Amino acid sequence: MFSQFFILNNKGETIIFKDYRFDISKDSNEIFFKHVQSMKSEITPAFNIDGINYLYIKKREMYFVFTTRLLVSPSLGFELLNRASKIIQDYTASLTEEAIRLNFILIYELLDELMDYGVPQSTGTETLKAFVFTPPKQIKSKQLESDSIIDNFLKATNKISVPPKQGVKPIHSGSKNSSSGGSSLSTNTVSKVVNNIVDSISGAATNLHNSTSGGGSGSGVTDADGDNEIYIDLCERLTVLYSSNGTILRNEITGKIQMKSYLRGNPALSLGLSPEFTFKTIANRDESNENEIDNNNIGGVSNLSAPSSNTTSFIVDDCSFHECAGSGFQPNNTINFKPPQGDFTLLKYRISNNNYTPFLVKTNLESTIRNRFDLVVTIRSNFSNKVVPNFIFVSIPVPKSTKSLTHSLDYGSQNQKVEYKQSTQAGNLVFWSIKKLRGGMETILRIQIHVDGATSSSSNNNQQQQQPQIDVGSTLRKEIGPIGLEFSIPQFSCSTLQIKFLKMLGSNISPIRWIRYITDSKSFVSRINN
């Protein structure tokens, strides 16, 4: 099926090269990189050169590539590339060039088990643990902290204290857990694992781990053992479009519950979500059952801020689950699942009927003086004053004929910075960065745009002054805007979705869990009255 798998950095240097079928020349990696560099923006993720098919994905400034002479489904190749990158991240703790080079022996061992003669075999982190025995080497903590976003997420709360290095560590660490199991696998256990491929990974992983460790669903989960913990991220991305008069034309939320599990024994867990949510995949629930949710089992959630609007319910347009939660939603918005070890997305959802935005944007563009435009941009934070965004970046396109530009800030100039950059890839842009804007606060940027008057002056020699001035002015106005916002708000859920509890089924022991919320912008655009 697949002949070669290799990883290149953004300079074209080979980090990993694995040849499965030996039917393609060894310089295929050089041919691939030369083609990518020559095509640049026109490159496609799948292409053919001299009868060789190349399929690749790019992650963390690295190229993950498959080559084959056969006609293989591209979607299959992309899925395997994504799974391979996920496995490498699970076993090396971070998907970086340095981590891969440091653990190249481990990665080659993983690739040997991943495919046999180019045919996919085992693509699950849990399943591969039975056959991989090389201990991972972890990058120094200082370097991990710079790559980790855990510390950025947790700066907004003073009750959760999670060192970043705990959230970035290899799954198969070879510590207390691996010394007792792994080497004492029975023949029956190994045969069960070998027979389970790609689509049945979760079940095989559960049987394997329970048989090797000999523990029940809640065995060994204690606060003293830091290896038994689970990290949960509730991430939401906003797509918002404001009209020139300030009304909302589009407001959509795309969210997911991302998990990273270090729990041993694959215990069955139950996750409870906010009862205010209505999912189209389940029937209407009796409101009297909402009081049955166990609010005392909230773990790792503190100071979570919700939108100030009193929204009673949200209708989720569509959602999808990970294979470990095959039964979907249970009564009272609970999800029962058995988490596999490593990174996985438990739930993805989309909300299109949202009527709340964390920022209110107003713009006003005037042209009172010839060859000058006055633009006023007002941004108001629409959330609790306890919430502080990590960053806010505002980009404002201006005409290409801009000769000079002046600006002034009404509030908080010490925490804000305005830069004007000419001849960027997107044209002339004004960048406005806001370091700190608490909830309920407002900031105003006033810009005076001075454009080159050569065009209008030459037109005035042949025609009356008024008509050319209107034409030129209307053309230049269309080159101003739209305004784009980029932001990230920690410990904030725009949809008010909250994780009410996370507990272990059939056991009184609660797993160690760390829950975080993050809301950021996918596309937040405001038009200008052109």
Curated annotation (Swiss-Prot):
Q: Which parts of the chain are coiled coil?
A: none
Respond yes or no to whether keyword Membrane is given for this record: yes
Q: What is its main location?
A: Golgi
Q: Name one Pfam family in it.
A: Adap_comp_sub
CDD domains recorded: AP-4_Mu4_Cterm, AP4_Mu_N
Report domain MHD positions: 227-527
Keyword Lipid biosynthesis among record annotations: no
Alphabetized, the UniProt keywords read: Endosome, Golgi apparatus, Membrane, Protein transport, Transport
Protein topology in the membrane: Peripheral membrane protein
- Where is composition skewed (Low complexity) in this entry? 173-186
UniProt region (Disordered), positions on chain: 164-187
Can you tell me which family this protein belongs to? Answer: Belongs to the adaptor complexes medium subunit family.
How this chain assembles, per its entry, is: May be part of the adaptor protein complex 4 (AP-4), a heterotetramer composed of two large adaptins (epsilon-type subunitand beta-type subunit), a medium adaptin (mu-type subunit) and a small adaptin (sigma-type).
> What's the name of the protein?
AP-4 complex subunit mu
Organism of derivation: Dictyostelium discoideum (Social amoeba)
